[in-house]
Amino acid sequence: MSNRTTGPGVTAAESTPSWEPRPTPPSGAPNVVVVVLDDTGFSHLGCFGSDIETPNIDRLAAGGLRYTNFHTTALCSPTRACLLSGRNHHSVGMRWLSNLDTGFSNCRGVISKSAATLPEVLRENGYGTFAVGKWHLANLEDCSPAGPFDHWPLQ
């Protein structure tokens, strides 16, 4: 019997992969849920003192982190680019809306490939990521109902 450390074995139990193991989050790592609501302010959510009852959002806020100091433009694409990258929307190329390329490096209408996004950083650390809804961060010619879903439509 050989002393191989990787490679095929007689059975699956005896085989070991020759590739690096996929990263996994540390034990006890938190779940990360980001909720983006258009046209919503502090005065609309119960967890920020509103008279409007929002029990499910209040419950999420009570058990997690609440960010209370986020400043950006009122346009959807730049706001989402800031949220996903943690950087100013000008510095990641999303000065206006997606699909509006002015030719200037800070206004290409897409998030720069050099700007890491929260989902990318989480994936590198073993998290599974999922996004749903209208993000408005990709050029229409880069989007298709067939995907690719590992980066569509965020970049």
What would you call each of these model-derived segments?
Residues 1-155:
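Formylglycine-dependent sulfatase
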